[in-house]
Amino acid sequence: MNEEERVGSSSSSSSSLPVSYGVDCEKYDFSSSVSSLSQPFSPEGSSNKSHVLENNLSFVFSLDHNSNSSLMFPRDRPCSCLHHVFEWILQRCCGCLC
């Protein structure tokens, strides 16, 4: 599809929502429906790889080089990375693990 066809097809109808084209002429249709808000600007057939990467990480390791044992924090409970950093600082400074 050349540039003239793209411009003509997106501006030919003033009542419809605009159409945008991304990399490799992927077509993105804008929609006013609520169901389209879950994955905006996502072409059909694409997958969200960040969820796959996050689900494969099961442990967070400590970077404490002074101790011989490596600390592992299981990720079975919901907590933030900041909580893990705080635990690491407490363990390193005062030897306690919350």
UniProtKB/Swiss-Prot annotation:
Know the name of this protein? Protein PROLINE CONTENT ALTERNATIVE 22
CC per GO annotation: cytoplasm
Q: Does the keyword Cytoplasm apply?
A: yes
Q: What does this protein do?
A: Acts as an opponent to RZF1 during early seedling growth in term of proline accumulation in response to dehydration and abscisic acid (ABA). Confers sensitivity to abiotic stresses such as ABA, drought and osmotic stress (e.g. mannitol treatment) by preventing proline accumulation and by reducing the expression of dehydration-inducible genes. Promotes the production of lipid peroxidation by drought stress thus leading to malondialdehyde (MDA) synthesis. Prevents pollen tube elongation. Necessary for RZF1 expression in seedlings.
Gene ablation phenotype (knockout): Reduced sensitivity to abiotic stresses including dehydration and abscisic acid (ABA) treatment. Slightly enhanced pollen tube growth.
What is the induction comment? Reduced levels in seedlings exposed to abiotic stresses such as mannitol, drought, polyethylene glycol (PEG) and abscisic acid (ABA) treatments.
Q: Name the gene behind this protein.
A: PCA22
What does the record say about tissue specificity? Mainly expressed in flowers, to a lower extent, in roots and, at very low levels, in leaves and stems.
- One of the GO BP terms on file: cellular response to abscisic acid stimulus
Give compartment(s). Answer: Cytoplasm
Sorted alphabetically, the keyword list is:
Abscisic acid signaling pathway, Cytoplasm, Stress response
In terms of superkingdom, the source organism counts as Eukaryota
